[in-house]
């Protein structure tokens, strides 16, 4: 076993003009006692320890304490043994004294008590199950009402969407009004191009024949800051 320790060096112990880094020392430490897993040493294998000699007073006192302990322990054992025997005799006597009619009456009494307990427990169970059944019915009814309300809202939204599409369908291009739609588109061209001048005026269209005046034209728009 090794023990690592830092060696403390003072300035007086250091030689002049030399520096010492972290000094490290190793110290060998032996076991204080022999480990328990090692066998007996050969030098002590056949050694018989000398028995300590007791004085007559000490031996007499130890014997007195030993006898006192044995006597007390024997008394406790005897008391417990008598208690067990008395309990067995009492139980056996009670059992022997009872007649068959008394045993039948006692058994019937136990049956009646058991039946009363079962009836009380059954009543409590029925009440608990009835309460749970009512709560479950109320929960299901609430869920059904919520589902019905959601279904009505969904139908209302669907009807509004259908009405909106019907209104939009009036402007749809079909086979019947396809030619008229083409003629209308050719007669009214739409140009999304525009231009902006230095004054911030916005001109829609690709070409403009006039310069901007004080009042903007229909195709002219003034940009606000």
Swiss-Prot record:
Subcellular location per UniProt equals: Mitochondrion
Q: Name one GO cellular component term.
A: mitochondrial small ribosomal subunit
- Source domain of life: Eukaryota
Q: Which UniProt keywords are listed? A: Mitochondrion, Ribonucleoprotein, Ribosomal protein, Transit peptide
* Principal location listed in the UniProt entry: mitochondrion
Do you know which InterPro entries this protein is assigned to? Ribosomal_mS26
**Gene Ontology biological process:** mitochondrial translation
What molecular function does GO assign, one term? structural constituent of ribosome
Its family remark reads: Belongs to the mitochondrion-specific ribosomal protein mS26 family.
Q: Which PANTHER family match?
A: 28S RIBOSOMAL PROTEIN S26, MITOCHONDRIAL, SMALL RIBOSOMAL SUBUNIT PROTEIN MS26
Complexes and interactors: Component of the mitochondrial ribosome small subunit (28S) which comprises a 12S rRNA and about 30 distinct proteins.
Q: What is this protein called?
A: Small ribosomal subunit protein mS26
Q: Which organism is it from?
A: Drosophila melanogaster
**Recorded name of the encoding gene:** mRpS26
